[in-house]
Curated annotation (Swiss-Prot):
Domain of life: Bacteria
UniProt keyword annotation of Cytoplasm present: yes
One protein family per Pfam: DUF150_C
Keywords: Cytoplasm, Ribosome biogenesis
Native organism: Trichlorobacter lovleyi (strain ATCC BAA-1151 / DSM 17278 / SZ)
InterPro entries: Ribosome_maturation_RimP, RimP_C, RimP_C_sf, RimP_N, RimP_N_sf
PANTHER family attached to this UniProt entry: RIBOSOME MATURATION FACTOR RIMP (PTHR33867:SF1)
Protein name: Ribosome maturation factor RimP
Parts forming coiled coils: none
Cellular component GO terms held in the UniProt record: cytosol
GO process annotations (BP): ribosomal small subunit assembly; translation
Length: 159
């Protein structure tokens, strides 16, 4: 069983549930753990999700998964918030979290304003402009990272 088929089917079942509750799908994971699988669903909303949101999505999705029987193997369903180190995947995420500390990793070496090459950028999100994510680095200079050069990005918790 390929991991992409169940993910697509789960997302199709999940999206109407989330839409009805005013929630956003942040990420879906489906991976083999021992002899069974783990289906992990990360959800969010502007003012954050709570335990009741997670429980309701879990109940609703469980019913749909049982009815549709789209995962043939044994699995465990987990529904949670994306946490403090929330992944940033969509352009809207970078806009929504302007001013927040984030880590952006790129697919290749890029230069910041001072010409220093790097693949990891730690700084404060300043938005998106002309297909580039703008980030004010903790050490001062700004970097503009082309959208297609972003390998991975997530919020970073500030102590």
């Amino acid at each position: 069983m390929s991991a992409t088929d169940p993910i697509q089917r789960v997302e199709t079942l999940l999206q109407p549930i989330l839409d009805a509750m005013g929630l956003e799908l942040v990420e879906l994971e489906f991976k083999k753990v021992g002899r069974s699988y783990l289906l992990r669903v990360f959800i969010d909303k502007p003012d954050g999700v709570n335990l009741d949101d997670c429980a309701e999505v879990s109940r609703e999705l469980s019913v749909q998964l049982d009815v549709e029987d789209c995962i043939a193997s044994r699995y465990t369903l987990e529904v949670s918030s994306p946490g403090l180190d929330r992944p940033l995947k969509k352009e809207q995420d970078f806009i929504r979290y302007q001013g927040r500390l984030a880590v952006v990793k790129t697919t290749e070496l890029l230069k910041d304003e001072k010409g220093s090459p790097r693949k990891t950028f730690l700084g404060f999100l300043e938005g998106v402009e002309d297909g580039e994510v703008m980030i004010r680095l903790k050490e001062g200079p700004q970097a503009r990272i082309p959208w297609d050069k972003i390998a991975k990005a997530h919020l970073e918790f500030e102590f």
